[in-house]
C-alpha cells in the first residue's frame, strides 16, 4: 500500500477531528461553570490552544525540510505561531483566547498560500473545518460571558 501525503489519510482525519475534543469539551464546560472552576477551565482551553498553534507552525519546518533549498521565510513563519501562542498565555485569559482565534486564522491563511506549493491543497478542507471549530470553541466562552 502506498502512502499518499498529498491528501489526509483516515488516521490524519481521526487525529485531526479527535484533536477538537478538548476544544469543544473545555469550551462547553467553561460556558456551564463559574468562579474558580471556570477560570481553571478557561486557562486549560488557552493552554491547549497554544499547544495546537505551536504544532501548526512546526508543520512549516517539516515542509521546509522536504525542500532541496530551504526557504528561510518559511522557517521564520514556523516559529511565529508558537511565539504568538506563548504571548497569548501572558495576557489575561479572555484576551489570550481572542488572540488565539486570530492566530488560528492567520495560520490557516498562510497554509492556504503554502499548501498548494507542496501539492497539499486537499488538506485545506480539513484545515478549514478544524480551524473553524477550534476558533469558535475559543470564542464561545468569551461571547457567552459577554452576553450574560
Locate the predicted segments by residue:
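The first (N-terminal) embedded transmembrane alpha-helix
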Residues: 9-31, 132-137
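Hydrophobic alpha-helical transmembrane segments
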Residues: 29-30, 83-92
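Interfacial loop-to-transmembrane junctions
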Residues: 113-135
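Short juxtamembrane and helix-loop transition motifs at transmembrane-helix boundaries
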Residues: 3-7, 34-42, 55-69, 91-94, ...
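Alpha-helical transmembrane segments and their membrane-interface exit regions
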Residues: 54, 102-114
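Core segments of alpha-helical transmembrane spans in multipass integral membrane proteins
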Residues: 17-24, 44-87
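Juxtamembrane boundary at the C-terminal end of a transmembrane helix
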Residues: 140-148
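Transmembrane helix-loop-helix
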Residues: 89-106, 148
Amino acid at each position: 500500500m502506498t502512502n499518499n501525503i498529498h491528501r489526509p489519510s483516515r488516521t490524519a482525519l481521526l487525529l485531526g477531528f479527535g484533536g477538537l475534543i478538548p476544544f469543544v469539551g473545555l469550551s462547553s464546560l467553561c460556558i456551564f461553570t463559574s468562579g474558580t472552576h471556570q477560570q481553571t477551565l478557561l486557562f486549560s482551553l488557552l493552554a491547549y490552544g497554544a499547544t495546537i498553534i505551536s504544532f501548526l507552525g512546526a508543520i512549516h519546518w517539516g515542509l521546509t525540510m522536504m525542500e532541496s533549498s530551504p526557504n528561510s521565510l518559511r522557517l521564520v513563519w514556523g516559529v511565529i505561531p508558537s511565539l504568538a501562542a506563548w504571548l497569548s498565555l501572558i495576557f489575561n485569559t479572555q484576551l489570550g483566547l481572542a488572540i488565539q482565534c486570530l492566530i488560528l486564522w492567520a495560520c490557516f491563511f498562510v497554509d492556504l498560500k503554502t499548501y498548494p506549493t507542496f501539492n497539499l491543497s486537499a488538506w485545506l478542507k480539513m484545515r478549514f473545518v478544524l480551524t473553524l471549530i477550534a476558533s469558535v470553541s475559543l470564542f464561545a466562552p468569551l461571547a457567552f460571558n459577554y452576553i450574560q
